[in-house]
Amino acid sequence: MNIQKDDWMDRRKIVRRNTQSSASTYVLEKLHIDLVIEILSRLSAKSIAICRCVSKQWNSLLVSQDFVESFLRSSLSRPRIWFTFRFDGKWNFFSSPQPQKFGNNLSVEATEHHMGSYENWYMKSCQSVHGFIFMSYNSKGMTDRTQVIWNPCTRQLITLPKLEPENLDFNSFFAYDPTEKQFKVLCMTVVNKQQTTSYKYQVLTLGTGPLLWRNIECPFMYRLRDKSNRGICINGVLYFIGWIKCSTMIIICFDVSSEKFSFIKIENAFIVTLINYRGKLGVYLVVYGSPRGEVWVLDDTKNDNWSKHNFVCPYSGQENSTWATGTGELVWPSSPWTQPFYVVYYNLERQSFRRVDIKGMENKVSTGKDRYDGFFTFTNHVENLMVLPLHKKTIPIQDTLTNRVMERETLTRSPLTQTAYASSYSTTRSYKSSGKRCSDRSIGEDEQDDIGEKRGDQAAERRERSTKRGKHEVH
C-alpha cells in the first residue's frame, strides 16, 4: 500500500512538473517575444534567476543578448545607491533603492551582497561603473596590490594580471566605453618616487581577448591630487583631478574609446569632488569652514561652457562622499556609526533636502568610531546581467635563474555562457604556476573542454609513436 502511495505521489509530481513546463511554453508561444522580454526585464536580478528554472525555453530566453540589453535599459530607470564599508575587520557590501519621489521621512530596505573571503583586505580604491564594482586592495602581510572586478548580480569575479614592474605605487581607474561596449582599466604607475609627475600609463581592455596591459602615452605632465583620488566616468570619458606645477588644479579627461588625454583648468578649493549631474560633469566646490558651496556643471564640452549653482550645505559630514543622482540631487551619506544610518538628498533646483533612512544594515553598521575602518559610497548603481567573456593566453616569461624562457599559462574565468548569470554562480579556484598566483577561473564547461583537449593531444601522441615504431620495424 505504501509502495502504491509513493508511486502515486511520484506520478503526481511528474504531471505537475510537465503541466508547469507546458504552461510556460504556451505563454512563450502565445505572447510576442518582445512583449515577454519587456515584461521580464522589469523584474529584479534575483527574480530572473528564479524564472530561469521554469523551463529550458525560459532559460534560453533569459540568457540571450537581447534580454540582457533590455534588462540593463530597464535597470537604468531604477538606480541604487551602493555602500562598501569595513566593520570589525570584515568588508560588507549593501545596496538600496534611490527613491525617485520627493518627500521627507522616507525609508528603504538595503540588500546585502556576498562576494567571498575578503576579511584581510586593505581597500585602496573602490568604484562602480555600469553595474560592475572595481576594487584595488592589499592583502594582509603582502606589499603588492591586487585588482579585481566584480559583478554583484552574476557574482563573476575577475582578478586582473599584475603590473610590470611590480611593487610600485600606482593609481587605477575603471571606465566604460558605450560606443564599443567595452570596459577598460587605466593604471598610472609612479616610475620615479622623487618625481611624482613621472607616470607609466597602461590600459587593460576586458571582453576582447586575453587580459593584457598595453602601454600608452600622455602628452602633458601632472601630479594626481592624492592617492584617494576617485575618478568618474560619464558618457565614455573618464575624469579625475590633478595638479600642474603644484599650483594649478586641473581635471584630466581620458577618452575611453580613443585613449587620448586632455585637461580642463578649474578653480582651486579645499574640497573638490567630481559628480555626475544629469549626465554631465559636475564639480562640487566647498570652502573649508563655510557652509556655502558651489556646483559647476560642464554644459558644453567642446566650447568649455559652465553653469554655476550656489547652495547652502544642509549636512556637514562626508563631503568627500558627495554624489549626485540622475534627477539632479546631491547625496551625502551620514557617518557610518550613526544610528539609524541615513542618506541626505539635496535638490539644487528646488533648494530643498530630504532624509532617507536605510534599514537592514543595523547589525553591520558600526556604532563606534573604533570599529569603523573604510567607507565607500556610490549612486546610480545598476543591475547588469552581463558576463564578461575572457580567454586564456600563454605568455612567455623570462626565468632569470636558468636564463631560459618559461611558458606560463594565465588562466582566467571563462563563463558557462556569454550571458549566464544570477543562479549560475560559479565556483572559483586559484591556480599557481611559475611560483605566481594566476587569475581565477570557473570550474565548469571550460574545464571539461580542457580535459577533452588533453585527451585529444594524448591520442595524437600515441598515434605518432605508433607510426614511428612502424617505420622503424620496416627499416
UniProtKB/Swiss-Prot annotation:
SUPFAM superfamilies: F-box domain. Residues 451-464 have a biased composition (Basic and acidic residues). CDD domains: F-box_AtFBW1-like. Residues 465-475 have a biased composition (Basic residues). It holds the Pfam family FBA_3. Residues 25-71 form the F-box domain. Residues 423-433 have a biased composition (Low complexity). InterPro entries: F-box-assoc_dom_typ3, F-box-assoc_interact_dom, F-box-like_dom_sf, F-box_dom. Residues 423-475 are annotated as: Disordered. Signal peptide: none annotated. This is Putative F-box protein At1g46840. It comes from Arabidopsis thaliana (Mouse-ear cress).
